[in-house]
Amino acid sequence: MNFYKLFFGINFCCLQIISRVIKSFQGSTTMKIFEFLISSLRLTVLTCLIFGSGQASAGDRLLATGGVIQLEGAGGGGLNPWALITGYGTDEQIGLSANYAKARTNGGYEIDSGGFGVGFYNRFELSVNQTKFGLNNTVPHESIEMDTVGVKLRILGDAVYDQDNWIPQVAVGVQYKKNEGFSFVPKLVGSQHSNGIDFYIAATKLYLGAIYGRNLLLNANLQATKANQFGLLGFGGDKHDSYSINPAFSAALMLNDNLFIGAEYRTKPNNIKTLKEDDAKDLFLTWFPSKNLSITSAYIDLGNIANKNNQTAWYLSGQISY
């Protein structure tokens, strides 16, 4: 199949997510801003469709330096946003990525996540993502969907090319999340809001040849959020209904030219009286056979979810990039 047809077909399907999200802003200034961003994104996709050749070639950045699309759609690891801009576009190029990921916990919860991101000139990122959370026997045959629209801006440094100093690449980001099933389960267990906005700052540095000649990537985040279980159980709670500052960390080692192994840790708030929420962590292995494709397998520990303790899962993600 022609790479462009596949890639942009996925992107046009994902644009429907944005249409649902911005309905909650009907008539507001925020909606006008979203509509402008969406129009710009559609123009970008159409331009690539018109002028793209049958053989897609990725941008000129180094392999893996766009990361992968994380749970909420930003470029990064599986759990955490990184300061890296998605795709492989340089400061003169536009990069794009689309992915699909699936996990099933030992308690039967299912997580399906898909979305795409566009990186503009290695400076600005726009992402769209939808996550579906299957409730298994907690509420049989039911699921909760969450839509996320995110933006990220690189404000300082270059994670790859600033090797002569200690300064990392630094980016700030915002993620607007809309829980489509709020009145069904989240509200009943004590969640206060159907939508929320997360703010984060990320610092990422790639150390070339740091460990026995292997490249080492380190990342740290600070996130301001009210989300319960990333937003899948709504925002705020009957215990706490204010923003908390939550740190997160990632480390990855490049075993060879196209294989990364790493770990992540993400702290989370604990807002609902009756539902204890634990921090999330993972161990991951990502294979980059080319710039256009990556496959990630991970073991995730999500701790307590709703009425089930010690929830762990194997996670599999596929991504195409340009």
Spans of model-derived segments:
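Cleavable N-terminal export/targeting peptides
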Residues: M1-V68
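Low-complexity, intrinsically disordered short segments enriched for Gly/Pro and polybasic residues
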Residues: L15-Q16, V21, P168, L216-A220
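Transmembrane beta-barrel domains of Gram-negative outer membranes and organellar outer membranes
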Residues: A58-A210, L255-L259, P269-N271, K276, ...
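Detector for outer-membrane/organellar transmembrane beta-barrel domains
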Residues: S191-N271, D279-A280
